[in-house]
Amino acid sequence: ATGQIVAYTDADVRVEPEWLTYLVEPFFSSSIAGSGGPNVVPADDPWLAQCVARAPGGPSHVLFDDRIAEHVPGCNMAFRRDVLVALDGFNPVFTKAGDDVDLCWRLQARGWQIAFAPCALVWHHHRSSLRAYWTQQLGYGEGEAWLKPLHPEKFVGRRVLWQGHIYSPLPFVRSLRHAKINVGVWGSAAFPSIYRFDAHPFAHLPHSIRWQLSGLVFFIVGLVLLWTPYRAAGVIALAAGAGALGTTLAKCIKYALDTEIDGLPSIARLPRIVSRFVYRWTVAWLHFLQPFARTHGRVLGFLSPPRGVSGVRDDQAAPVPLPRLQLWTTLRLFVGGSVQDQFWGESWVNPDELLQKMTDWLRSSRAIHIIELDDGWRPHRDFSVAAGRWVWLDLRALVEE
């Protein structure tokens, strides 16, 4: 490409004649390095593709706010050519997925920004078979596994730590409750937010691969124990496994029931009521299937890491890994013990300034949701960090001359 702006799309995408006009518009009104827009499934896609579009794991934009994005999908994005040259283009190691995420993260590590162009919409044909959907999610999982060594600061364990937010039509975590909006006294609250960020940490647990595999193991072990003298233990294990899997299935069914399908046509010659049942059953099945495909891909990516590419590229910012606690340290803290860490510096460090920088960094990392500062009545700590629903870590700083 020789132009000043390079646009990207996929072979399974249809664009409107005005697409490029809207996509490049942010480049002329702000000093941004890239832009991207939404992708929507076309109405003429097959019925299974419509279900896949309503299943988890599809390509989506991640937004910091209404104008700036953390990530835009590879099927609908554009970048300045000089920025691509400075970044040495896409990383060739990502042959299945993850190339767009890697480029967006490296771009932002340089201090550049990506604009979101909501009018630059493309029609994205989704996978039209279960095998194709499984293969897609397999590739996404493999791409995630290869992203982790290149961007360790973007991960907490195996989970991607997005700084922005995903505005998705999927019911997902919030589908099991009806959120209320604070409208103020007599409706006086201006512009109340309809988005919630306080989802219970256990809300997504039944949809995780650990939960599903644990439930399956308990169920199988329970069946085996029923044929042994340990029938009581078998009944307990069987009940635990059935309860875990039943919870997952119930949530998947609830997701499917909350999915909008009213505008979809009937399937072939099936009656409308039967078509709606097939739509919802397929969406529920895809919700159940997706974590297994992603995990399978992550395992494959971990077992077959890319060759010939270093862990950190020259155009990346130096990785700043998030702190991790070793097992022994975790046990000491769990029983009420303490851990001391110290460092030496050539210049004086103001403890208030140090603590402020630490709390600012923790808040910006999105890994920590709740930080409680000392109110002056607790001399044993300077601030506390919520490490879970019932676990708090207290931190105290001391400066010695």
Per-segment meaning from a language model:
Residues V6:
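Short aromatic/hydrophobic "clamp" motif used to bind/position activated sugar donors
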Residues G37-P38, V52-E70, V85:
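Short, flexible, basic/aromatic active-site loop/helix in glycosyltransferases
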Residues V13-R14, F94:
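Acidic metal-phosphate-binding loop of nucleotide-sugar-dependent transferases
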Residues R14, E18-A49, Q113, H125:
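Conserved donor NDP-sugar-binding/catalytic core segment of glycosyltransferases
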Residues I114-G222, A250-H296:
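Active-site-adjacent helix/loop segment of glycosyltransferases
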Residues T2-G3, P73-L87:
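Conserved nucleotide-sugar donor-binding
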Residues K96-L103:
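Acidic donor-binding loop at a coil-to-helix junction in glycosyltransferase catalytic cores
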Residues T9-A11, N91:
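Active-site acidic Asp-centered loop
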